[in-house]
Amino acid sequence: MALNGADVDDFTWEPPTEAETKVLQARRERQDRISRLMGDYLLRGYRMLGDTCADCGTILLQDKQRKIYCVACQELDSDVDKDNPALNAQAALSQAREHQLASSTEPASSSRPPSQPPVPRPEHCEGAAAGLKAAQAPPLPAAPPNTDAVASTQTALLQKLTWASVELGSSTSLETSIQLCGLIRACAEALGSLKQLDH
């Protein structure tokens, strides 16, 4: 039976390839970061506008001085993002080529697909891959911590933590309170890390 002149076999669903899954996951993570940042800015008094960024399509924000602000362009996009295949148009073309190659060389009815020669990656991917390989290198063994430095750092952190707690108790500004809470959390995390160094 044909639908609009097409075979029913043309409509079989195939799960996304590993590359497509990575692209979708990276886009989802990027959208989550944008949403979190936008929420933070809205709490600081920014207004959400009915317009979107001409470059990336993200909803624009406006501060109290009426300056237009795009969270994605001004905070997330960096040189690292340009090399990220999930966010780069060139990587999308590579993905389309991979899909075409996979569909044009469908395996025969045998249980093992024929081996395919490796497809060379574009140069812009090589730098990102090298960065990943370097990041996965095993860490060097840590030198024993200098107890004087650890103790003086703990003292400074405890003083800063005490000061921030007192300031938070007397703060009437939401923005200041948010910043003080962030400082308290950072001090607590740093103290925890220093305690791990001591043990």
Curated annotation (Swiss-Prot):
Expressed in the early postnatal brain. It is found in: Cytoplasm. Its cofactor is Zn(2+). The modification Phosphoserine is found at residue 94. It comes from the Eukaryota. A motif (Nuclear export signal) lies at residues 173-194. Residues 93-148 are annotated as: Disordered. Zn(2+) binds at residues 53, 56, 70, 73. Residues 127-137 have a biased composition (Low complexity). GO terms for cellular component: cytoplasm. InterPro entries: SSSCA1, UPF0148_domain. Its main location: cytoplasm. Two ORFs are contained in the Sssca1 gene, but only this protein is efficiently translated and expressed. Might play a role in mitosis. Could be a centromere-associated protein. Antigenic molecule. May induce anti-centromere antibodies. Homodimer. This is Protein ZNRD2. It comes from Mus musculus. The gene is Znrd2.
